[in-house]
Amino acid sequence: MHILVVGLDYKSAPVDIREKLTFQPDELGQAMAQLKEEKSILENIIVSTCNRTELYAVVDQLHTGRYYMKMFLANWFGLSKEDISPYLKFYENDGAVEHLFRVSCGLDSMVIGETQILGQVRTSFKLAQEEKTIGTVFNYLFKQAVTVAKRCHAETDIASNAVSVSYAAVELARKIFGDLSDKHVLILGAGKMGELAVQNLHGHGIGQVTVINRTFSKAKELAGRFSGAAKSLNELQCALMEADILISSTGASGYVVTKEMIEHVNKLRKGCPLFMVDIAVPRDLDPALSEVEGVFLYDIDDLEGIVEENLKERQAVAEEVELIIEAEIVSFKQWLNTLGVVPVISALREKALTIQAETMQSIERKLPHLSTREKKLLNKHTKSIINQLLRDPILKVKEFASEADAEEKLALFTQIFDIEEAAFPDGERQDERQPVHAFKRQNPQGLTSIASE
């Protein structure tokens, strides 16, 4: 059993590739359910955001799992494996656990320390629970990932004053225009990204804000909180005629603003420049807009320069988070170690309790005059003897799980107590059931492992 991550992010793929491989929120549950049916996949969770699409899975074989996860991505989005292979990253076992913890803490985000990703990981985790695509390993691992992120936020300053992609978009506007007090900004999309953009603009004394959203009531609610105006999507062209800056972050699957639309609007703008920032993935703004005179178009990847400044400032804090993550990986591995010995411990307990039950039946046959109270006392104390006798062997077998020769020791243990058949009813050997042994064989070099095809 192995843990495997297959995916791409803003570091490995440009936005024109990422937008082709982004799961829509309403199809994520179906995608997880379908991925679970693929060969080798035992458990899975999909995390898909504007900056990453990643498949997390527990697999029975690394090579097979890697192949079928890659093919699943290609088939789902109607692409060939050759189309997506150059952009994919692979994390295995320890490297996969480390990667999940880094992602959840915001350490792997374009904007270091941003907390939005934690909410997105939790949403995917909850959906996987509802779809029943996860089991023991991922239930534990993703709960720990959330706990690790909360610990990092509480014990370090990683989330303090962390900027967002929306903040970076506003900063880009400030770098170009300087003073924003006489500018009219149009926000397209009233979701979290749009809300953060309005918040940042308001903090920098923007002259006027107009919010447009597919659901007008949401646009009105957001605009009202910041003394802005709200318009319906039908009024988009009119709003574009008045705007100096457009920041777009809808969840649309196609372009919301096209080249043809802006060419029509431009005739009425009389040559006034229009600054446009697209922070949506898939993109809201047609890339062909950059060909229109007077239009200055930027997408999410163009914000990297502003984000770099944030990275330098937060590097020292990031190192503190790395130390917490390393300790938490050790903790997870200790828990994972015990999974391999669970059937051994269960078989030992079952055998001991069977002996105790048979002994009680024998006593009751030989001493028929025993009262109900006396039988209960005898039952209680014989079970107590069993528990005390098993305590040290169980502690010892848990210690075996972390040792290099664990397989040999566990085999000897099951022979001594004559429980091999009960512990492994299907004839499975211990190395087939012990995930951490696989971790040690496949990833001997340390904490991080990014595999290549």
UniProtKB/Swiss-Prot annotation:
NADP(+) binds at G189, A190, G191, K192, M193, G194. Gene3D superfamilies: Glutamyl-tRNA reductase, N-terminal domain (3.30.460.30), NAD(P)-binding Rossmann-like Domain (3.40.50.720). The keyword NADP applies. It comes from the Bacteria. GO terms for biological process: protoporphyrinogen IX biosynthetic process from glutamate. Its EC number is 1.2.1.70. Residues 426-453 are annotated as: Disordered. The keyword Oxidoreductase applies. It catalyses: (S)-4-amino-5-oxopentanoate + tRNA(Glu) + NADP(+) = L-glutamyl-tRNA(Glu) + NADPH + H(+). GO terms for molecular function: glutamyl-tRNA reductase activity; NADP binding. Substrate binds at T49, C50, N51, R52, S109, E114, T115, Q116, Q120. Possesses an unusual extended V-shaped dimeric structure with each monomer consisting of three distinct domains arranged along a curved 'spinal' alpha-helix. The N-terminal catalytic domain specifically recognizes the glutamate moiety of the substrate. The second domain is the NADPH-binding domain, and the third C-terminal domain is responsible for dimerization. Belongs to the glutamyl-tRNA reductase family. Homodimer. This is Glutamyl-tRNA reductase. It comes from Bacillus licheniformis (strain ATCC 14580 / DSM 13 / JCM 2505 / CCUG 7422 / NBRC 12200 / NCIMB 9375 / NCTC 10341 / NRRL NRS-1264 / Gibson 46). The lineage of its organism: Bacteria, Bacillati, Bacillota, Bacilli, Bacillales.
